Structures are given as C-alpha cells and as structure tokens.
C-alpha cells in the first residue's frame, strides 16, 4: 500500500495530512507544500536482520578534550563559550541586512589568520561579490578559500577533499540536496541539508557555521528540528536605526546560554564593544521623568540599560499600551499590581515603554525598574541620575531579590552610580562605594521614593 503524502508549512514546519491554503498553526497563506521525506526505505520495522555492534566507551577518560580555537574577536569568543569547539555545528540567524554575512566573513578571516584552514561557501552571492566585501572590510589578505555553490553534494565532496577545519555555509536555506524532491528553502530541503552538514561535522571533525534566514516573527525559518540538530544557536539582533548589534546565544552545548556579545556597525565592518553599558547609556542626558537605569544581567555579563516611560491622558475609549524592547504581558501585570496593591490606577492613561538604544530585555529583575519608570512618568518626578534599580515584583506586591546582585552593583559603580534600589533579602553583598536601599514590597517603595501609597 502506498504511503499517503504529507504536507509541511514552509514558515513554521507544521505537518498535515492534506493541503490547505492557510496553515492552521501559524496562519500564513500559501506556505503548505508536499513533503518529500529523506528516507527512501520501506515503511516497515527493521525486522530480524542483525546490525553491526557499535563501539562503546566509558564516560570517564584520561583523554584531554580538543582545545578551543579563539579568533581574536573577544565578543564572538565570549558568546561561543570561550572559542570554537572542533566538530561543532553552529546556526546563526538574524534579520536581512543586520550584518550576519559581514560578521561571519570577519570571523572567517580571523580564524584563518589564527591557523585554521577555512572555507566560506556562499549560496547567495558570487565569489567576486564576497571578495569585494572583503576588500572593503580590509580582509583581502586573509587566507580564506571562497566558493559560490548551492549543490549540497558538490559542497560535501569539496569539503571531503579539502579537509578544512572550519566551513561557513551562507545560507542553509539556499542549499539544494538532489535526493530530496522539493524546492530549495522548503522544509524538506532545509532539514536534509542541516542533517547532512551536521553529520559531516561530527564525522570529520570539521566545525561548521550555518547562516539561517528568519521569519517575520524573528524565528529561524524552516523546521524547528534544525535548531535541535546543531550544537549552538546564535541570534544576531539590532535595530536599523541604531549602530550597535547584539549576538545572543539561545542554545549552547559547550558554554552558557543567553550570553551576549555587543558589536558596533562602522564603515569598516563590525567592531566589538567591550563596555556595552557605557554605549547604551552614552546618550543619556539630564534626569527626566520616566527615565530609570536598570542594572541587568545578560548571560554572565552585567549590562546597564535605560528604561523610558511616558504616561499621558488617552483621547480614546480604550487606553493604549505600547512596549518596545520588553514583554507587553509583563507590563500589563505591573500595571495591575500597581493598581491592586498600591491604589495607583492607570485607567484612561496611555502608557508607552521603551528600552533605550534598541536593547531587548527579558529578565524578571527589570520589574522594579519598569514600575519606577511608570511612577516617575505618572507623577512627573525624576529619580536621581546616580541611581540604578532592579528587583522582581510578585503578584502580591512583594519584591524578590535578583541574582548576581554584587556583579550588578560593581558594574553600576564602575560607571559612576552611587545609589541602588533593590529588593530586600538574598545573599549579603560587600560592594563598597555604592549605597544600597533595600525594599520589601512595592507599597514601601512607592511611599519612600515617590511619597505616595
């Protein structure tokens, strides 16, 4: 009996048994395509035929792990967990034009200069175009081998013959496997190409970096299984109106996840920013209502960013809630806690919240800084310019201490801040030179800082 066909959404990877004009999972139109599986074998069990026994090893061993290779770009090495691990597969995603190809071309040049045999394969540009960009970035003398190809079989044959230590594939969506009957960029093609390249990396000890396109929602396009296949998933983020870019690790088998590296886009490519807090606060002027500095932690790195809030009477029947750089659902929670526990209503008021510089913050410890910015804007009262705020707010109005308090305070002190407002409790800290004002609940915070509540 013939196997019934399956259909996949090219946007989200959802699999269905029949074709439809609109994907039921993500709602996208005209993205359903027939899925041609990778395997051509029969859809039966393995049966009684015996396979070869695999070689087993002990978990404990005296063999030293292969050393990491650093490229000299400190921010990239930090995100990778201390350097490039041999035989690792890395997926890098980001919006179009954000600088993925520029970053990886610079990384390829640095790795090649450090002694790694490096091959850069582009499926989107001709070799001459990649060479032009390398000349503009001052990388023309780097010993990097270039190729412009999309046929996966030819690429794997070339890698087998050249035996590089690092291969960069730009991008995985342009790769074409001739054993899969689907168009390049489809779910089947992306899954097959990622599987073949990842298997090659493990089998031959080659580090492979894959560039991935992203969807409108900011997720890497193609099936989610690709992110499970690779060892590391990096997102390259940034706002087009700002000069800096953030490389964020969302998965890393060989280092900390949520680590970030900060770069600045210049005429000569991407330059690393060793002190991102100073960059994010560089344009901060005199203290103004609604402006609060949050001492946050991104991965293992303390980062200071500015929250800006604006509260104004709403001319509409339903007040607006606009958030940039933070979670809108968490803003609604903070507004509800302020009204229920402190008696401060925001009904009939438009609320706008922004993280300055285009930075994205997801840490719960930003709750208290957001509440302070909202109250400062509503009461038209500025917080002192030398004060940082951090702490998590519970639904009861109690404040919970944040982790790594000492690292946050040290970073704030380094940038000239002398006061901090945080939740009471947690481990005692010994940072001198900065006064720490501990609050137990949101009511006491409102009463002491803003004289209300």
What are these regions (language model features)?
Residues 2-11, 15-80, 85-93, 98-109, ...:
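Peripheral, non-AAA+ core regions of ATP-driven protein-machinery
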Residues 118-122:
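Conserved RecA-like ASCE P-loop NTPase motor core of nucleic-acid helicases/translocases
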Residues 123-129:
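Conserved Walker A/P-loop ATP-binding site and its immediately adjacent core
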């Amino acid at each position: 009996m013939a196997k019934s066909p399956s259909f996949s959404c090219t946007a989200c990877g959802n699999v269905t048994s029949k074709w439809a004009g609109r994907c039921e999972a993500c709602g996208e139109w005209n993205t359903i395509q027939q899925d041609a599986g990778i395997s051509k074998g029969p859809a039966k069990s393995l049966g009684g035929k015996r396979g070869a026994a695999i070689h087993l090893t002990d978990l404990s061993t005296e063999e030293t792990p292969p050393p990491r290779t650093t490229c000299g770009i400190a921010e990239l090495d930090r995100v990778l967990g201390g350097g490039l691990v041999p035989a690792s597969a890395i997926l890098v995603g980001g919006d179009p034009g954000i600088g993925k190809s520029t970053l990886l071309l610079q990384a390829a040049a640095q790795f090649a200069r450090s002694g790694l045999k490096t091959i850069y394969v582009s499926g989107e540009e001709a070799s001459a175009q990649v060479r032009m960009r390398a000349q503009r970035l001052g990388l023309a003398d780097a010993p990097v081998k270039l190729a412009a190809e999309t046929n996966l079989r030819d690429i794997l044959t070339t890698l087998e013959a050249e035996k590089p230590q690092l291969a960069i594939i730009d991008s995985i969506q342009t790769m074409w496997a001739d054993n899969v009957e689907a168009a390049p960029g489809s779910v089947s093609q992306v899954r097959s190409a990622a599987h073949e390249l990842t298997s090659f990396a493990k089998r031959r000890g080659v580090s492979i970096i894959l560039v991935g396109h992203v969807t409108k929602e900011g997720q890497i396009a193609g099936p989610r299984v690709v992110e499970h296949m690779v060892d590391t998933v990096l997102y390259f983020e940034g706002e087009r109106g700002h000069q800096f870019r953030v490389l964020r690790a969302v998965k890393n088998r060989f280092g900390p996840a949520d680590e970030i590296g900060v770069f600045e886009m210049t005429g000569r490519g991407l330059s690393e920013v060793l002190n991102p807090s100073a960059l994010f606060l560089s344009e901060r002027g005199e203290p103004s209502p609604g402006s609060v500095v949050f001492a946050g932690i991104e991965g293992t790195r303390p980062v200071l960013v500015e929250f800006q809030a604006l509260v104004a009477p709403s001319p509409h029947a339903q007040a607006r809630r606009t958030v940039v750089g933070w979670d809108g659902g968490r803003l609604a929670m903070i507004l509800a806690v302020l009204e229920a526990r402190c008696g401060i209503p925001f009904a009939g008021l438009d609320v706008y919240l922004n993280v300055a510089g285009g930075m994205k913050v997801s840490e719960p410890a930003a709750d208290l800084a957001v509440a302070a910015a909202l109250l400062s804007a509503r009461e038209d009262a500025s917080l002192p310019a030398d004060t940082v705020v951090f702490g998590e707010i519970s639904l009861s109005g109690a404040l919970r201490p944040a982790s790594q308090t000492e690292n946050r305070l040290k970073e704030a002190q380094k940038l000239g801040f002398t006061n901090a407002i945080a939740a009471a409790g947690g481990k005692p800290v010994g940072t001198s030179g900065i006064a720490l004002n501990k609050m137990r609940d949101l009511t006491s915070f409102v009463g002491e800082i803003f004289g209300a509540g």
